[in-house]
UniProtKB/Swiss-Prot annotation:
It comes from the Eukaryota. Belongs to the jacalin lectin family. Coiled coil: none annotated. GO terms for molecular function: carbohydrate binding; IgA binding. D-galactose-specific lectin, binds the T-antigen structure Gal-beta1,3-GalNAc (Thomsen-Friedenreich-antigen-specific lectin). Potent and selective stimulant of distinct T- and B-cell functions. Shows a unique ability to specifically recognize IgA-1 from human serum. Signal peptide: none annotated. Tetramer of four alpha chains associated with two or four beta chains. Residues 1-21 are annotated as: Disordered. This is Agglutinin beta-2 chain. Keywords: IgA-binding protein, Lectin. It comes from Artocarpus integer (Jack fruit). Residues 1-10 have a biased composition (Polar residues).
Amino acid sequence: NEQSGKSQTVIVGPWGAQVST
């Protein structure tokens, strides 16, 4: 999900780790 001018939150794995880019 690419949102212009906003950060992307990526949910990785069953642990629900959140990576903000």
